[in-house]
Structure formats: C-alpha cells, structure tokens
Amino acid sequence: DDLLHDFSQRTGIVTSRHGNLQWRSIPKTISTDVYRVVQEVLLNIEQHADATQVQVTMANTGNQLCLTIQDNGQGMDTTQLTVKKGIGLKNMRDRIKGLQGQLLIDSQLGQGTQVQINVPCEMID
C-alpha cells in the first residue's frame, strides 16, 4: 500500500487496490521479487502510459499468487515488446520465471495495459 500511495503522491495518478491479500502473507522469498516487478510496472506506467488511473488486484487462488496491475493509459502494441531494447521487461520476466511463475501483458492502443503476475505460492497465515 505504501508503494501505491507513494506512486500516487509522486505522479498524481489515482491508484486503487483490490483484494484482501496482504504483502505480509506472501513469503519473503517471493514477495521481494514480486515487489520489484510491481515497482518496474509502475515506473513504466509513469514514463510511458499517460494514464490517470492504476488498479492493483491481489488474490490467492489455491496455491497461487495472482496480481494484476491495470492502467487506463494509451496502451501499446504488444508485438513490439520483444523488439524494444531495454532491460526492464527482461528483468521482470526473469524475476517471475525464477519464481516458476508467469508474466502476461495484455494491451491495445488507446485502451490501457494490463500486467498479470501468477506465481506458485504457499501463503503465510
């Protein structure tokens, strides 16, 4: 929540968080990498999306952490993601892959972007 609050204060982009899963419920071995990926996604939104709203949803479905970050920005052509230079996307994919997880990006020009992170995870009570 501090990350979203700080992001909103710094950028003026309205943020909302949904779901009842708390960061402290995620094992540290997983939460650190996922947190870094969320930071990178927010940085990309700030620098490229021209968004006014960001919604973050965190859920635990079975033994899986499901985190979705969605903005209402300008969107992008996802076919260009593998062509673009830059280490941000590669680092995000590598971090999630290292957790045996999956990073999915869905976007269309003019319709915002959604990043979904799915990671196997036994939650802490």
List PLM regions with ranges.
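Coiled-coil dimerization/phosphotransfer module
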Residues: 1-125
